[in-house]
Amino acid sequence: MLLITPDELKSYSVFESVKTRPDELLKQDILEATADIILKVGHDFSDAEYIPLPETVRLALLKLSQFYALINGDESIIKGYTTEKIGDYSYTLGDGSSLQKPDVYALIKDYVKPADPDLEGIEAKVRMRSI
């Protein structure tokens, strides 16, 4: 379920690498960001009260999606190199250390659902045996 579109992400971002990234890859980045937000808030924004999607949640999704698009699109991070030399030509690539995952908690904190109070205080015992 996409809560934002690749076109919305492209118009939000100032990074050329995000704007030129194929829509199919941006959809994967958006899904990754959506899964991250759902994990933090405890629901998937499918209830009628979240239509339209709150602006702060939308902004959080845009920020995280842009982050994932930048990380997933940076070949130098995956390959693990920072400099490369070809003949007389050399260049330096980012190592990802300056790119940090944005903290979007302040944007989504109003939408975090508390744990089910019926589950509090329940004990469970698990028996395990070695194989």
UniProtKB/Swiss-Prot annotation:
Record's Pfam families? Answer: DUF3199
Q: Which domain of life is it from?
A: Bacteria
Entry-linked InterPro entries: DUF3199_YqbG, YqbG-like_sf
Gene3D superfamilies xrefs: YqbG-like
Q: How does it assemble?
A: Monomer.
Q: What is this protein called?
A: Uncharacterized protein YqbG
- Native species of this protein? Bacillus subtilis (strain 168)
